[in-house]
């Protein structure tokens, strides 16, 4: 899987939100942006809207405008129990995890 693959990004987002939950911290908005994953804004919005629709994430405000979608309240994002279950039980997310680990081995500073 490529680093910009849907399941790789979903894994990273859910893993980050789960770590924030366990630490009792609010997520930093800078980690919940398209630029954090080097992807196009439309692709990022698709991913986040999918996570919200599937009820894996909640707390993000979605505002539909004539120019598109605005995502707000990013520091209020939280992974749901359904999202935690998906994180640990989805085989495609396991492949994404392996992809990220392989990249870290090749590029130590990632």
Regions found by a protein language model. Give the residues of each.
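Short amphipathic alpha-helical interface segments
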Residues: 6-36
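Short amphipathic alpha-helical interaction segments
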Residues: 38-60, 74
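Short, amphipathic alpha-helical interaction segments positioned at domain boundaries
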Residues: 67-102
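Short linear capping/connector segments at secondary-structure termini
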Residues: 29-33, 62-67
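Short acidic DE-rich linear segments
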Residues: 103-110
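Generic structural signal for hydrophobic core residues of well-folded globular domains
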Residues: 17-21, 51, 87-90
